[in-house]
Every structure is written in C-alpha cells, then in structure tokens.
C-alpha cells in the first residue's frame, strides 16, 4: 500500500486506496470522496420486525454517524473558510516553504505550473471546505473539498507536489 504524506509536516493525507486523477498539469490531484455510515450495526434478533417496532425505513441508528471516508480515514481537520486575501497569503507562504524541498525537474514543473493551479483554486474558493492533516501544523498543506454539480459526494483536491509517497 502507498500512503501520501504532507511533504512539509509528515501528516498522512491520502493513500492509493483512493484513486486520483491529475489535473492542472499534474499540480492537483482530484480524488472522489464518499459519505459512509460509521458505527451502524444491524442486529436482527426477532422474526417479526414490525412487532418489534423496527422497519427498514426508520433511518440511521442513534450511534451511527455519517462521515466522509477520506476525512475519517486520515483524520483530516476542517479549517475555517478562507477569503481571497487569506488564501493568497497562505499559498504564497506554502510555495515559499515547499519550493526548496523539491528537486530538479519537480521544482521546475512546480514553478512553471503553480500559478495556473492557484488561479484554478481561486476560481472555486467560495465552494471549498478546507482541511489539514491531523497535526494541524501552521505549514500544513491544505486539502480542498467541494461538491461537483449534482453530486452528493465531495471531490477532494490535493496539491500534488506537496505529497510524499511512502510504501507501507
């Protein structure tokens, strides 16, 4: 199994269990999340569910919780929304911190393509939920989540150059 860590903080953000699609010249990875019910245990001990007051359309058990698989698996922490000014300040600092960690062609590709990826992110800024890794470091990579038109499940965007592949 491959795990992808935040290059700056070491927080685990993604694994190969969640397939990704490269967009914006490989600067961003697009990953489909999914709402799942966690903690629901269906115990059927009787032969007559209607006599027990149990029906299949009752909804979700009190102890069951709906979570997004990626957020739950990697214990991502939701952050307050960013306005344009806050986001530009963040991305400038992130680029400054990340660039020296990249080598050779990766650094050149990053410098060449990060501006268009940043513009793409800015165009969707109002639609995003923002997440960081479990450690909640100041220098963490942001993970962006949004809902595509008509989708009930969130799509996540990762800044690909800021991820480090680790074999488990």
UniProtKB/Swiss-Prot annotation:
Involved in calcium binding and microtubule stabilization. Disulfide bonds: none annotated. One of its GO terms (cellular component) is cytoplasm. The keyword Hydrolase does not apply. This is Translationally-controlled tumor protein homolog. InterPro entries: Mss4-like_sf, Mss4/transl-control_tumour, TCTP, Translation_control_tumour_CS, Translational_control_tumour_p. It comes from Solanum tuberosum. PROSITE patterns: TCTP_1, TCTP_2, TCTP_3. Keywords: Calcium, Cytoplasm. Residues 1-168 form the TCTP domain. It is found in: Cytoplasm. Belongs to the TCTP family. GO terms for molecular function: calcium ion binding.
